[in-house]
């Protein structure tokens, strides 16, 4: 399971011109689900994303996690994170989870985060979405479980 996380000043997602999720300061989480992923990996990744200290403290050091910084998260399903890109000119997607399982684990990831006390906004699974964000820093990390 893969999370590409970006520290943002703001982020939003629209589907068919309608705003369906929006946050101020916090994390934009692009979530990719792979075939071997399961509930345990999902929970561990949620814990790791929320605990990852990439927000500045009073000394301007990355010592605060998103909750300590008072932020929210916007989670977007992103199957292309599981792409195989090591050869050729076209990505392969055979490592990605089947859509039904990917959707289940995407929803579980969001539920796990909510249960850990963070405000979660989401995109729409498998929809054609437009995601806008202001990357703060820029600060972007790839987390994989």
From Swiss-Prot:
Keywords assigned by UniProt, alphabetized: Cytoplasm, Hydrolase, RNA-binding, tRNA-binding
> What positions does the record give for the motif labelled Gly-cisPro motif, important for rejection of L-amino acids?
137-138
- Its Enzyme Commission number(s) read 3.1.1.96
Catalysed transformations (reactions): glycyl-tRNA(Ala) + H2O = tRNA(Ala) + glycine + H(+); a D-aminoacyl-tRNA + H2O = a tRNA + a D-alpha-amino acid + H(+)
Recorded family membership:
Belongs to the DTD family.
Grouped into one coarse class, the protein's main location is cytoplasm
Q: Which SUPFAM superfamilies match?
A: DTD-like
Name one matching Pfam family: Tyr_Deacylase
Q: Subunit comment for this entry?
A: Homodimer.
- The organism is Psychromonas ingrahamii (strain DSM 17664 / CCUG 51855 / 37)
Q: Name one GO cellular component term.
A: cytoplasm
Q: What is the top-level taxon of the source organism? A: Bacteria
**What is its subcellular localisation?**
Cytoplasm
Q: What is this protein called?
A: D-aminoacyl-tRNA deacylase
NCBIfam families to which the protein is assigned, alphabetical = D-aminoacyl-tRNA deacylase
Give the organism's phylogenetic lineage: Bacteria, Pseudomonadati, Pseudomonadota, Gammaproteobacteria, Alteromonadales
Instruction: Respond yes or no to whether keyword Nucleotide-binding is given for this record.
Output: no
Question: What this chain does, per the record?
Answer: An aminoacyl-tRNA editing enzyme that deacylates mischarged D-aminoacyl-tRNAs. Also deacylates mischarged glycyl-tRNA(Ala), protecting cells against glycine mischarging by AlaRS. Acts via tRNA-based rather than protein-based catalysis; rejects L-amino acids rather than detecting D-amino acids in the active site. By recycling D-aminoacyl-tRNA to D-amino acids and free tRNA molecules, this enzyme counteracts the toxicity associated with the formation of D-aminoacyl-tRNA entities in vivo and helps enforce protein L-homochirality.
EC class, as a word, reads hydrolase
